[in-house]
Structures are given as structure tokens and as C-alpha cells.
Regions:
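An N-terminally biased module of ancient metal coordination in phosphate/nucleic-acid-related enzymes
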Residues: 1-91, 97-98, 160-176, 181
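Domain-core and long-helix interface of multi-subunit machines
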Residues: 12-14, 103, 107-195
């Protein structure tokens, strides 16, 4: 069995403090042959306490992981990737990101719903939770129509983790037709789907 992980966040992401060296050593101890670091980059993510979030310092990131890759080349294959937030309002930046092709892998994900973050409780106050989830899936289809620079679409049901308790019991069948169109669109674009 080939063990690998291609969705890893580290201290380069606003939501992690993990040291990449620890990740590499753990992967080696587990017998992994390949890993791919995919720290977050979300253009125009909402500020948190006045701080810019999920804005990757690309050059520093590439330099760090190229050095790490070289240091461990005889023990494990390290790939450099990114989890890129997809959104119509930043499609030009998404589509031109990594124009020098320094990345091995890009996960495209919809973390924001037309610029709003479902992580925050205020997101859920504007309409019913079920309608908010519907809007999320509609935004994914919109994002897929304009953002093309990714290899695999990440965590399609991302929003489910943030649905407020006792508001709506998530069931993907409620959005079956729309999810079918989303999956068909991803496949027609020749992209993979993260499971």
C-alpha cells in the first residue's frame, strides 16, 4: 500500500502552528513515501481582529520547502502545494497564481461564500441554515465557472462543519441536483475530487 498525504497545513497557514519538520519526521515513521504540503492561501479573506488571514508569503514558502525537500530527499518525496481559496471576485489572481509553476499541486477550495466566512456565527444569522448551505453550493458552482488554476477540488462539504447546532441537520441529499452539477463540472474540467 502506498501511503501519502496531500492536504497538510503547517505554521505557514493561519490555522496551524505545526512545524513542517515534525510532519516530515512523523510521515517517515509511518512509512509514507510521499507528502505534499498545502498551506492556505485565500485572497481577500475577512480580517480577524484586524489581522490579514490566510495570505501566504509565497516566496518564503517556496524557499522553505525547497530546502526541506532537499534535506529529506533520500528519505521521502516532499511536494510543495497550496490550498487556494476560490472565489469569483479574485478569479484573476487565482488563475495567475504560481505562473512560474513552482508548485507541484494546488487544491482549490471554497472557504468563503461570496466573500463571507461560514466560520463566523454572523454568517448564519441572515437566513435559515438550509438556505445558507444552498447558497454555499451555488457559490461553488460560480467559483468553478471562473477559477481554473487547481488540480483537485477540496472538501466539497466544508460548510457542514460550521452549521450551528440545533439549526439544521445537514443532509447532502437535500442538495443532490446541485451537487451532481458541481461534481460533473469538476470532472469535465479534468480536475480531481478530494475524498
Amino acid at each position: 500500500m502506498l501511503l501519502s498525504d496531500s492536504h497538510i497545513h503547517t505554521m505557514f497557514s493561519s490555522d496551524s502552528e505545526e512545524n513542517p519538520v515534525n510532519v516530515v519526521n512523523n510521515a517517515i515513521s509511518l512509512g509514507f513515501k510521499h507528502i505534499c504540503f498545502t498551506d492556505h492561501n485565500d485572497f481577500d479573506a475577512p480580517l480577524e481582529d484586524g489581522k490579514v488571514m490566510f495570505d501566504l508569503d509565497f516566496q518564503e514558502y517556496i524557499k522553505y520547502f525547497q530546502n526541506l525537500k532537499e534535506s529529506y530527499k533520500d528519505k521521502i518525496n516532499i511536494h510543495i502545494g497550496v490550498e487556494q481559496g476560490l472565489m469569483r471576485s479574485v478569479a484573476d489572481r487565482v488563475n495567475s497564481y504560481d505562473s512560474a509553476k513552482q508548485l507541484d499541486f494546488i487544491i482549490g477550495s471554497s472557504h468563503l461564500v461570496y466573500g463571507e466566512d461560514p466560520y463566523y456565527p454572523e454568517f448564519w444569522e441572515k437566513c435559515s441554515a438550509k438556505d445558507a448551505v444552498l447558497t454555499y453550493y451555488e457559490s461553488i458552482l460560480d467559483n468553478l465557472g471562473c477559477c481554473h488554476n487547481f488540480d483537485v477540488y477540496g472538501h466539497l462539504d466544508y460548510i457542514a462543519r460550521y452549521i450551528p447546532a440545533n439549526s439544521y441537520s445537514y443532509n447532502w441529499h437535500d442538495f443532490n441536483d446541485l451537487i451532481y452539477i458541481i461534481l460533473k463540472t469538476i470532472i469535465e474540467k479534468g480536475k480531481g475530487i478530494e475524498i
